[in-house]
Every structure is written in C-alpha cells, then in structure tokens.
Amino acid sequence: MKKVITYGTFDLFHYGHMKLLERAKNLGDYLIVGLSTDEFNLQKQKKSHHSYEHRKFILETIDLVNEVIPEKNWEQKISDIQKHDIDTFVIGDDWKGKFDFLKEYCEVIYLPRTDGISTTQIKKDMASL
C-alpha cells in the first residue's frame, strides 16, 4: 500500500483544498493529512477562523482522507514520515524547495495551487464586505 502525507491549516475549506487532496490521494492508496493545531498556527502568527477540532471534523468527513493527525511543529515531519511509513510527501508549490530535505526519507512532490482561490483571498474578500 502506497502512503501519502500532506500538511496544512485547511481553514475555510474550499475547492482548492479539495483539488489538492484529490491530487494527493491519486498518488497513493492511503492519505494522511497533518492538520496544523491552533497552538502551532499561533506560533506561525496565523489565526484560523475555525478551530482545530472543526477543521479536523471537516477533513474526516471527506472520503479521500484516510487519517488526520495533528501538526504541532515544523520538526515533526521526519518522525511522521517514519512512524507512518510514508512513500510520498505532497504540498503546494508555494513551498517549492522548502521540504527537499525530506527526499532522504520519501518522494517529495510540490503540487500547483488551484488558480483563483485561496483562504487568504477569501479572508480579504470577507473583510471588505
């Protein structure tokens, strides 16, 4: 069984998130999503509209996602890859090159973002209403 992992905040879940998950799942048989905790988001100076538990619930209801694990810090990726026997690490290409160090442990793929939609843009649009 080929296992794939991706990470993200997945706040204000939208079409672009779904396309990322679909493309990630198409690369393997089992998809794990490392979901940023509220505490980790604060460390990154980000604030989610939805709580970790609500974002986790949304992801767990999506058939493409087999498992959701908490992302608590930047450093856990290597241990997650080893613990879950990951074959492929997938993330958006806005992170291109940032996770090349993981190639020692698994395949690393940077997927193109879906044009025209992002959580940041949704938040800006909502703020301007």
From Swiss-Prot:
Task: Please verify whether the record's keywords include Cell wall biogenesis/degradation.
Answer: yes
> Can the keyword Nucleotidyltransferase be found in this entry's annotation?
yes
Q: Which Gene3D superfamilies match?
A: HUPs (3.40.50.620)
One GO biological process term: teichoic acid biosynthetic process
| Keywords linked to the UniProt accession | Cell wall biogenesis/degradation, Cytoplasm, Nucleotidyltransferase, Teichoic acid biosynthesis, Transferase
The compartments listed are: Cytoplasm
**Gene Ontology terms for molecular function:** glycerol-3-phosphate cytidylyltransferase activity; metal ion binding
Q: Which Pfam families match?
A: CTP_transf_like (PF01467)
Q: Per its UniProt record, what CDD domains does this chain match?
A: G3P_Cytidylyltransferase (cd02171)
Any one Gene Ontology cellular component term annotated for this protein: cytoplasm
- Pathway the protein takes part in: Cell wall biogenesis; poly(ribitol phosphate) teichoic acid biosynthesis
This enzyme catalyses: sn-glycerol 3-phosphate + CTP + H(+) = CDP-glycerol + diphosphate
Residues annotated to bind substrate: 44, 77
- Give binding positions for CTP: 9-10, 14-17, 46, 113-120
Enzyme Commission number: 2.7.7.39
What this chain does, per the entry, is described as: Catalyzes the transfer of the cytidylyl group of CTP to sn-glycerol 3-phosphate so the activated glycerol 3-phosphate can be used for teichoic acid synthesis, via incorporation into both the linkage unit by TarB and TarF.
Q: Which family does it belong to?
A: Belongs to the cytidylyltransferase family.
- Its quaternary structure? Homodimer.
What is the protein's name according to its record?
A: Glycerol-3-phosphate cytidylyltransferase
Please name the source species: Bacillus spizizenii (strain ATCC 23059 / NRRL B-14472 / W23) (Bacillus subtilis subsp. spizizenii)
